[in-house]
Design a protein with these regions (language model features):
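Short, flexible hinge/linker loops that cap or flank conserved catalytic cores
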Residues: 8-10, 19-20, 45, 215-217
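Alpha/beta-hydrolase-fold serine-hydrolase catalytic core, especially in secreted/extracellular enzymes
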Residues: 279-290
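Conserved HGGG/HGGXW glycine-rich cap/lid loop of the alpha/beta-hydrolase fold
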Residues: 17-61
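Flexible "cap/lid" subdomain of the alpha/beta-hydrolase fold that forms the substrate-access gate
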Residues: 12-14, 31, 52, 59-89, ...
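Catalytic histidine-centered segment of alpha/beta-hydrolase-like enzymes
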Residues: 256-269
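N-terminal cap/lid segment of alpha/beta-hydrolase-fold proteins
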Residues: 1-13
Length: 290
C-alpha cells in the first residue's frame, strides 16, 4: 500500500496520500477499498492539482477509537475535520461508491468548502444499500465478516472473486493491489469489527434528508457514471444532475463498472481536467448555497 501521511483530528489519525501541487483535490473512496483506488487517476492529475486521497474510518491505514461513529454522518463530519487539520479552505471533491453518499452529506452541509464536485457511481438518495449488496449486509448482520475476511486473506483468488463484481476486468488485478485492499481491512480482530460496524451503519435516511440542501448547492458539479454497474444504475446519475443546483451534466462511460476510476483513469482524468477548468472559469472559489 502506498505510504501514508496522517492528519490528527477529533475522529482519530486519518491516513492519506498526497501528490502534486496546486489547488487541493480530495478523493474519497467507498466500502472495502481505500485511497489506493485513485492512484491511476492521480498519476494523471498531480500536475494540475494537489491530490489528496483519504482513507475513510475503518479502512486503509486510518486509526480511530473503538467507539467512533462510523456512519456516513460520522464520515462526513470527519472529512470536514480532516480538511481543517490540513488547512484546506476549499477543495475539488471526487468520490466513488459509498464515498459518493458521504461526500453528498459533506458538500450539502458545508457548501462553502466545495470548489467543485465530481460524483461517480455510488450511493444516492434512497438507493442504498442496493439489492446487489445484500450478501454483504447479511454477512455483517450474521457476524460473518471475520470469516469472509480470513478467507480473503488466505486466498487472494477468493479476494479477487469477492471484488470481481465491481470491475470490468478483475483478472487484471495484481496480487499487490488485492493485498493493499484486503490486508488493512482484516489486519486484526479490532479492525475487522470496525469494518462490520461500518457496514451495519449504512442507512440512507440522512441522504434523503439533505435533498433540499443539495438543490441549493451551487458548486459546479459533474457526474461521471459507468453504465455497466450492477449496484447503481444510470438513473441515479440523472437524479444527481437534476437535483444538485450546480450540476452541469452526466458523462456516461459505456460498460464501466463500479470501480472504473481504477480501471479507466484516462477517461476520468480527462473529465476532471475539463470540469476543473470550467469551475475556474465560472469562479467556483465563491460557490456556496443560496
Amino acid at each position: 500500500m502506498e505510504k501514508r501521511l496522517y492528519a490528527s483530528t477529533p475522529f482519530g489519525d486519518i491516513a492519506y496520500t498526497e501528490r502534486g501541487s496546486g489547488p487541493a483535490a480530495l478523493f474519497v473512496h467507498g466500502v472495502f477499498l481505500n485511497g489506493n483506488l485513485w492512484r491511476p487517476a492521480i498519476d494523471r492529475l498531480s500536475g494540475v492539482r494537489r491530490c489528496i486521497a483519504v482513507d475513510l474510518m475503518a479502512h486503509g491505514a486510518t486509526r480511530t477509537r473503538p467507539d467512533q461513529d462510523l456512519s456516513f454522518d460520522g464520515q462526513a463530519a470527519m472529512l470536514l475535520a480532516f480538511c481543517d487539520a490540513l488547512g484546506l479552505d476549499q477543495v475539488d471533491v471526487v468520490s466513488n461508491d459509498s464515498g459518493t453518499a458521504i461526500v453528498q452529506l459533506f458538500a450539502a452541509r458545508n457548501p462553502g468548502r466545495i470548489r467543485s464536485l465530481t460524483l461517480t457511481n455510488g450511493d444516492v438518495h434512497d438507493n442504498f444499500p442496493p439489492p446487489a449488496a445484500e450478501p454483504m449486509m447479511v454477512a455483517a448482520k450474521q457476524g460473518l465478516i471475520p470469516e469472509v475476511g480470513q478467507r480473503m486473506l488466505a486466498d487472494l483468488e477468493d479476494a479477487r472473486a469477492q471484488f470481481a463484481v465491481g470491475y470490468e476486468h478483475p483478472e487484471r488485478l495484481s496480487a499487490d493491489t488485492l493485498r493493499a485492499y484486503v490486508e488493512p481491512l482484516f489486519s486484526s480482530p479490532e479492525r475487522t469489527k470496525e469494518v462490520e460496524r461500518f457496514i451495519l451503519a449504512i442507512d440512507c435516511r440522512s441522504n434523503v434528508a439533505v435533498e433540499p440542501l443539495l438543490r441549493r448547492l451551487m458548486a459546479p458539479t459533474l457526474v461521471v457514471w459507468g453504465t455497466g454497474d450492477i449496484f447503481f444504475g444510470i438513473e441515479w446519475a440523472h437524479w444527481l444532475r437534476d437535483t444538485i443546483g450546480g450540476a452541469r451534466r452526466v458523462i456516461e462511460l459505456p460498460d464501466a463498472k463500479l470501480f472504473f476510476p481504477e480501471e479507466r483513469p484516462d477517461e476520468l482524468a480527462a473529465a476532471l481536467r475539463e470540469h476543473w477548468q470550467y469551475a475556474e472559469c465560472v469562479g467556483a472559489g465563491t460557490a456556496a448555497s443560496a
